[in-house]
Structures are given as C-alpha cells and as structure tokens.
Amino acid sequence: MVRFFQRNDGVIVEAEIHGLPRTENGFFAFHIHEGDTCIGEGFPNTGGHLNPGREVHPKHAGDLPPLLSDHGSAYMKVFTDRFYIEEIIGKTVIIHSDPDDFQTQPSGNAGMKIACGVIQRL
C-alpha cells in the first residue's frame, strides 16, 4: 500500500510493500507515472514518469527514492515538494524490477514494471 499525506509545503509518501521478488541487492525503482491505468501485462499504459516541469531524470516530479526490500518486504516514508496530492490523483505508482541508476535518460534504466497501482482519494 502506498499512502500520500498533504502538508502545506509538499507531500509525505509512505509505502509498505510485501511480495517483492528477492534480488541480489534488494533495491527497486519507485516512481509516479503519468498514466491512469494498470490494465495489461507489463502495465503498458502507465506512460512515463510524472514530469509536468519537463525536467531531466532524476528530477521528474514522479521520481521517488528506491525501495529497499528485506525478504520481499519494503517500508519507506519520504517527504517531497515536487507535487501536491491533487496533481497525482488518477496517476499510477509503479515499482520496477531494477534499481534506478539516477542517470540513464529518460527513466533511470529501472527495468520492467512489476507492480502498479492507481492513486485514488480515500
């Protein structure tokens, strides 16, 4: 589950993820994408990283720190001032198979999309 908490100057992102594949280094790229659906194998309609300011990677609004998995589970809590909750409702949050290298354009060589969720207001 990924939850977002609006603050005056940005958003707290809290992720608690279970069932991640075991990998050698345990890092998984974690991004908000511009698309609005998780339908289809490999989630082909999630679009690119959320990037309304047309920044280069890793400065996209949707670029988040990587998840670090321990035996298939990861927990992360981070603050960002790159977006407000209203801007991400209906967008997708993606976990990739590989860590983000923070250099390769346009998406950090993050590998396949292995998990997807549509961001909704509760």
Predicted features and spans:
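N-terminal leader/targeting pre-sequences
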Residues: M1-L122
